[in-house]
Amino acid sequence: MKALNRAGWRTGSADEFIGLKREETALVNMRLSLAEKLRGRRTKLGLSQTELALRLGSSQSRVAKMEAGEVDVSLDLLVRAMLNTGASAREVAQAIAAA
């Protein structure tokens, strides 16, 4: 990076590039961490996205969006899905803290 800076290039993070505020970056990271943990729990339980969707009263496409960390999925729904797969409140908190 130093070489790029010396050559006149400006360097920074992806967050800086797209102009995210600190709290927005934190929310993105929390969402992605919960999404990753949810997918891991679902697959460990041997559930398909459709099966998890039925347990949540949702759709397969919504579960796919949850697991992709889509911005239009609420953190509430991600937490509810984690709890539905048997995650404890502590495990949910650890996923958020890992962000």
Where are these regions (language model features)?
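DNA major-groove recognition helix of helix-turn-helix/homeodomain DNA-binding modules
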Residues: 74-92
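Short basic helix-loop element that most often maps to the first helix and adjoining turn
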Residues: 7, 36-51, 55, 80
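Recognition helix of helix-turn-helix/homeodomain-like DNA-binding domains
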Residues: 54-72
